[in-house]
């Protein structure tokens, strides 16, 4: 009996000692990040006493998984918000607001219209346009600087991420070795591994699981592996010839690489990539669409007037080249494809990417795809051999507002894919083509006069100038009207008139006129002429009105007023003015920032609650450990008394035997 009592007391001592050690371990690691409270389990022995079992970690894998998921979500929105809030504060700053520079430029045009002969006012208007161009560059620089910051942060994050996965893999090896030579679990190593997994979730949305050996494996939310037992993978940035500005990721397995879907990555890496692909691309293309619309509208209108030297106006702005991309094996073919915005057709240009490919021997197709790669419209199919080319080899795709030149058309094979985005980088490439204010075409290219012998008070006025191209209008290359063009309007009655050329030959006759605006349109001649005229009231029989290029005054501001009025025209996508479009863009940035900020705040609350749930189970409580320590100390003392009693009993028995 005494020997049994001795065994019971000894096992109690061992049990109490082990639990005191566990309590001491918990207490000493109260501030250790990632440490999970440990507990030494025991069971009653069938022969008496207590049997020590494992010292295990108090963890709930479901709660730990939730902590990682919520950490990833918060990190995603926090990173996204930090980037977009910077963009919001910069783009919305009044001192660099594009609308301020737009208003200043058009105000300067209005001012010079008051005195078109003033060189100083012309130069002031030219300086305002130059400032506007520089502001496009500034705003584009804000976007590109943020893109550079994303690239730098992403490179750093991937380096840290790959280091973490390597450490997790290394810990798997250590755990396998340590638990193979011991009956106790490698608690501290597993705590380190859990902490690394939590750190990893700050970068990506991951799933941590344990295989049949009890080793941690890491997968992305889409199922792609990052850690397989003792074999880590590596995440890398990969170049994409079709989308050079797009961030592509690959998972390297050492001997081969697999492309990674970048949607829904979560964590800070997902936040950086989504900011770049969603907001940064959108901002760059929005500014580019804005710049294209401004340049095209101003250039088109300036070509309809005469500059200070009496010459037809030329382009005020210049646009950069539109880059054409293709797959790596087709890069040489892409160099033979040129694309530009058709003159006067910028309203048709969208922020989409355009995909060109050859469908068969003769036909090509172009379709528009959005930033997500989804088609946004029906594909346009055309046969280049049937389209008329200009002197530079370009043919028009009217539906898209684009001119295309295919120099190496015979080299292009069926199903070759080429992509280009007209608005990409267009704001950064915008330039001022005119050298000074004298290039601003304020005057109309044609004058009108009312016959001195007319019997009525009706006065003729120039209504519009729509085309000055010598090949398609009444204007010759030297600026004069072709002799065959409309030169005179003669009223045969108050309600009928004829249009005559310079030789008096009748070009058209119109009768039953009750409204006297756009007389050439009524005669069916306005499109060919490229201009139109109106009279102020009902003429009388015999009234004559003339048009020609010798009736232009130096102070004429007809085209200058049209240039200034572009501020009020719906130039962006044919739906919004320049100012309204940029204001809408700033509103979008503000609302997007507020939306992301709301998600960041709410996800932080959810994450903190998950961490608190984990801590309630796994974190060390000094109060609880103090109670346990007192209890185990008392248990140790009691077990020692049992051993003492067993020894006393044994000695008493020996004494009796003597």
Question: What function would you assign to each model-found segment?
Answer:
Residues 1-658:
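S/T-rich, low-complexity, solvent-exposed segments of bacterial secretion/appendage proteins
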């Amino acid at each position: 009996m005494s020997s049994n009592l001795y065994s019971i007391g000894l096992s109690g001592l061992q049990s109490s000692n082990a639990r005191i050690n566990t309590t001491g371990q918990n207490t000493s690691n109260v501030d250790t990040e990632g440490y999970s409270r440990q507990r030494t389990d025991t069971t009653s022995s069938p022969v008496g006493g207590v049997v020590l079992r494992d010292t295990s970690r108090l963890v709930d894998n479901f709660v730990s998984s939730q902590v990682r998921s919520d950490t990833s979500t918060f990190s995603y929105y926090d990173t996204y918000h930090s980037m977009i809030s910077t963009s919001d504060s910069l783009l919305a700053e009044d001192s660099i607001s594009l609308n301020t520079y737009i208003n200043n430029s058009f105000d300067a045009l209005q001012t010079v219209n008051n005195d078109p002969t003033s060189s100083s006012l012309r130069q002031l208007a030219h300086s305002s346009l130059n400032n506007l161009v520089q502001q496009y560059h500034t705003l584009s620089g804000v976007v590109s600087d943020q893109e550079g910051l994303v690239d730098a942060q992403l490179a750093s994050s991937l380096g840290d991420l790959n280091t973490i996965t390597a450490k997790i893999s290394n810990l798997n090896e250590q755990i396998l070795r340590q638990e193979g030579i011991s009956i106790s679990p490698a608690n501290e190593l597993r705590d380190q591994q859990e902490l690394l997994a939590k750190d990893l979730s700050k970068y990506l949305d991951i799933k941590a699981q344990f295989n049949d050996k009890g080793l941690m494996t890491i997968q992305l939310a889409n199922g792609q592996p990052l850690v397989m037992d003792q074999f880590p993978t590596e995440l890398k940035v990969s170049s994409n010839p079709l989308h050079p500005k797009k961030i592509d990721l690959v998972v390297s397995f050492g001997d081969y690489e697999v492309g990674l879907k970048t949607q829904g990555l979560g964590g800070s890496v997902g936040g950086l990539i989504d900011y770049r692909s969603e907001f940064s691309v959108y901002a760059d293309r929005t500014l580019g669409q804005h710049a294209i619309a401004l340049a095209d509208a101003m250039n088109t209108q300036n070509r309809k007037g005469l500059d200070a030297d009496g010459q037809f106006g030329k382009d005020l702005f210049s646009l950069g080249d539109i880059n054409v991309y293709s797959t790596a094996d087709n890069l040489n073919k892409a160099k033979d494809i040129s694309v530009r915005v058709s003159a006067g057709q910028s309203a048709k240009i969208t922020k989409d990417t355009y995909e060109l490919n050859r469908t068969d021997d003769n036909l090509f197709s172009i379709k528009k795809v959005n930033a997500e790669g989804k088609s946004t419209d029906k594909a346009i199919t055309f046969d280049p051999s049937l389209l008329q080319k200009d002197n530079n080899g370009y043919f028009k795709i009217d539906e898209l507002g684009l001119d295309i030149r295919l120099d190496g058309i015979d080299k292009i094979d069926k199903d070759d894919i080429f992509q280009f985005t007209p608005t990409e980088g267009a704001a950064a490439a915008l330039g001022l083509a005119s050298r000074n204010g004298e290039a601003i075409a304020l005057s109309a290219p044609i004058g009108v006069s009312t016959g001195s012998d007319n019997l009525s008070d009706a006065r003729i006025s120039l209504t519009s100038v729509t085309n000055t191209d010598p090949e398609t209008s009444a204007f010759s290359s030297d600026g004069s009207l072709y002799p065959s063009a409309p030169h005179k309007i003669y009223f045969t009655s108050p309600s009928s008139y004829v249009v005559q050329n310079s030789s008096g030959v009748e070009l058209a006759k119109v009768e039953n006129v009750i409204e006297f605006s756009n007389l050439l349109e009524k005669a069916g001649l306005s499109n060919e002429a490229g201009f139109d005229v109106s009279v102020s009231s009902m003429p009388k029989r015999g009234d004559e009105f003339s048009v020609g290029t010798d009736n232009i005054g130096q102070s004429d501001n007809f085209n200058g007023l049209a240039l200034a009025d572009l501020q009020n025209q719906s130039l962006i996508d044919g739906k919004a003015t320049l100012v309204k479009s940029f204001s809408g863009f700033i509103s979008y940035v503000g609302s997007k920032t507020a939306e992301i900020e709301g998600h960041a705040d709410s996800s932080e609350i959810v994450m903190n609650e998950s961490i608190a749930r984990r801590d309630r189970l796994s974190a060390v409580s000094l109060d609880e450990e103090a109670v346990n320590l007192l209890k185990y100390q008392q248990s140790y003392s009691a077990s020692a008394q049992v051993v003492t009693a067993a020894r006393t009993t044994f000695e008493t028995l020996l004494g009796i035997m003597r």
